[in-house]
């Protein structure tokens, strides 16, 4: 359980509201409240409705001093392609919050939302070891992180269950 604990730090690349690609870390939001939400994959059935719902209510989050970050195990290029796909064709259009890439699944793993992954320890020719993760996606997890970087609220939904944006706003 992560509630009341310091939110795991991350640094990754993200597609920003203006469609630029930038490095983003949780520490960039120090002193701000953050909703960090995970979704399974780009170009899937339920996910666009949730991402669009966050975007539609973004001004309400901002009026409460809350930044919104979305994250999946997809690449920044997949996020960008999804943003550049019309909503009527299964895309998400130009959502106005950052979409974080998590190709190595380290962010999803650190927030304990990764499901269906298989880990393997791989040793290089130089004898150095590394843990790799194959397969797996993020469950629908939502985290409210306070100004000090502490997780104050967490909700985790199984893959077929959508999340309630009103509940995140209520928190």
Predicted regions and their residues:
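Chalcogenol-based redox active-site neighborhoods
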Residues: 1-171
